[in-house]
Amino acid sequence: MANQKKVTNKTPKKPSVNFDRTKFYTIEEAVNLAKQTSNAKFLSSIDIAIKLNLDTSKSDQQLRGTVSLPYFFGKEKRILVLDKGLTQKDAKSLGVNHAGDSELIAEISKGWLDFDLIITTPKMMPELSKLGKILGTRGLMPNPKNGNVTTDLPKTIAEFKKGINQYRTDSYGNIHMVVGKANADTAKIVENINFLLSFIAAKRLTSVKGIFIEKVNLSSTMGPGIRVLVNKTAVVKKTAKGKVIADDSAKGENKKPAYLIQRVKYAQKKKPSKHPENPPVITEAKKKKVKKILKKAKPAKKAAVAKKPVVVNKKTATKKSPAKKGDVKKAKTSKK
């Protein structure tokens, strides 16, 4: 009896899928791998991580905003609407979970946080700004860049209910976002990724030099990261109001997006590796430059300066110099 194994009711784990983690996969291959490597007991999401060439310590190199993907797979958020004159009775007509004015702001200050998103008007921001320690640390503070500070509440509420994803670079310049679910159609997830990459590429900052999108990784919840080779993407265009939308009239395969062209240019300018099989070529011009640099680096020896002969002024020479002890004794003996 002691040697018998205990019988448990745990569900068996899915067999692990072996794949080369150093290899770059196409978007479609990466999505399929992310689905296969999902071993969670719950319905896992497909997450994307986009590494951008940004120095987030600088205020002009931070990216944040909202994007509406072709297919929304996120969670339904509990929405709180704040405006002067609103009450909880108005929540049903607006189609949100909670609605109110200064009374609800007072409840938040006491610790009430039964919501995931705040949509408000500019008039309420002075009161909300006092709750920075409560809302700011949880990422709930409304911001005009995120689109949840507006004068048109019905329109903004409708957009967020359809599915608007907020994005913001972290301290390392990464953007994380859910682009699908493990049971979703692969084609829909691929379309979301293509649109998101083109959208981010269109948001390139003028202060950035070189490649803007450096790396793209895909993974399922609690799954391994999969490197993505971005070789094809949808083409986007900007409307008169500056909104980025998909350009169905353009042929995506014939037009390369900006970040792909930069990637090719960077690969051409890449320096040769220091591997012994591929040694760097040293030309005569480089040798001459090195010699010049070495000459400048060595300090030149100072030429010996000949000492000038000391000219004795006759007027100053007549002054008596201080007598030595031996001279004083000789003077005393001579007087005797």
From Swiss-Prot:
Q: Where is this region: Disordered?
A: 267-336
Q: Quote the CDD domains the UniProt record gives.
A: Ribosomal_L1
Pfam families membership = Ribosomal_L1
Disulfide bond sites: none
Indicate yes or no for the key word rRNA-binding: yes
Q: Which InterPro entries match?
A: Ribosom_uL1_bac-type, Ribosomal_uL1-like, Ribosomal_uL1/biogenesis, Ribosomal_uL1_3-a/b-sand, Ribosomal_uL1_CS
Write out the GO cellular component annotations. large ribosomal subunit
Q: Which UniProt keywords apply?
A: Repressor, Ribonucleoprotein, Ribosomal protein, RNA-binding, rRNA-binding, Translation regulation, tRNA-binding
Q: Which GO terms describe its biological process?
A: regulation of translation; translation
SUPFAM superfamilies hit by this protein? Ribosomal protein L1
User: Which parts of this chain are annotated as the region Large ribosomal subunit protein uL1?
Assistant: 1-245
GO-annotated molecular function: rRNA binding; structural constituent of ribosome; tRNA binding
Annotated spans, Unknown: 246-336
What exactly does this protein do? Binds directly to 23S rRNA. The L1 stalk is quite mobile in the ribosome, and is involved in E site tRNA release. Protein L1 is also a translational repressor protein, it controls the translation of the L11 operon by binding to its mRNA.
Subunit and interaction comment? Part of the 50S ribosomal subunit.
UniProt similarity note:
Belongs to the universal ribosomal protein uL1 family.
Name recorded for this polypeptide: Large ribosomal subunit protein uL1
